[in-house]
Amino acid sequence: MIRSATLPFASALPSLPDNHRLRLFSGSSNSALSQEVSRYLGIDLGPMIRKRFADGELYVQIQESIRGCDVYLMQPTCWPVNDHLMELLIMIDACRRASARQITAVLPYYGYARADRKTAGRESITAKLVANLITQAGANRVLAMDLHSAQIQGYFDIPFDHVYGSPVLIDYLRSKNLADLVVVSPDVGGVARARAFAKKLDDAPLAIIDKRRQAHNVAEVLNVIGDVQGKTAVLVDDMIDTAGTICEGARLLRKQGASQVYACATHAVFSPPAIERLSASGLFEEVIVTNTIPIPEENRFPQLTILSVANLLGETIWRIHEESSVSSMFR
């Protein structure tokens, strides 16, 4: 079930005037989310032809005049990431050639974000390459949610709005009135994210799962830094991919005496064997994610809760269009 989190945002905006220049188009990767955003904004999705030729090439044609318009292109670059990325680039190019005044690429999920630096010789920094492609295609601005690496914003020489799914996740957790809460980072790299999350939850205590290898060819040892005994642990991450890290962390928290374990993440990548790990492990009371990436019915399981970020994205798009503050949404 997808729950719409309306707080702290309105359920819909006031009606736009007939002569407004805001246009919203959807790629094929998450049309359901795009429809929700369009309802929040009170506008229809722009008409567009998308098709694939027999040889696999993609084709896009905008079906209305967008000359002088402020155009927003919704396209999370999730699986199949290369097809969805290429479709986004073609959409941007089509809008540029149609004389749009401003083109904003809206990426609720930014694929290739984990390839943000070289970890070995002769590697590509693919997150930077994607930034170059989006810019060169003709985007004037990018709007993305919960980047795996915040420094990706610096890969762009155009305005970049980085928004967070935490208001939606936190609002839902507050509604559950969980007692003895402790926010847990599944690794040292996620401490800043977990700390900010804990602060919004009435300064809840913070714990960290620390991985360290004692010697070469020796398995990693996991330690919990912080007190979780008898507490409700909320594991917070930007994404759940194969679910190995978060299940490993939950298992350790249970061993250390946590009474309940919840998992929270913005992006449900859910690469195999994530569904089997999350649903069959019995480790989690609830796995809470958002709908930045579509989750097919066959990948849903009883412990899964999907929260909608449509209102948050819609409000952000409206504020950008109206040249209002975006950062004030997250204070």
UniProtKB/Swiss-Prot annotation:
InterPro entries per the UniProt record, alphabetical: PRib_PP_synth_CS, Pribosyltran_N, PRibTrfase_dom, PRTase-like, Rib-P_diPkinase, Rib-P_diPkinase_bac
Q: Where does Mg(2+) 2 bind?
A: D187
**Residues at which Mg(2+) 1 binds:** H148
Which SUPFAM superfamilies does the entry mention?
A: PRTase-like
Which SMART domains does this entry report, sorted A to Z?
Pribosyltran_N (SM01400)
User: Which reaction is recorded as catalysed by this protein?
Assistant: D-ribose 5-phosphate + ATP = 5-phospho-alpha-D-ribose 1-diphosphate + AMP + H(+)
Alphabetically sorted, this entry's keywords are: ATP-binding, Cytoplasm, Kinase, Magnesium, Metal-binding, Nucleotide biosynthesis, Nucleotide-binding, Transferase
Indicate the residues that form the catalytic site.
K211
The protein's name in its UniProt record: Ribose-phosphate pyrophosphokinase
**In which organism is this protein found?**
Synechococcus elongatus (strain ATCC 33912 / PCC 7942 / FACHB-805) (Anacystis nidulans R2)
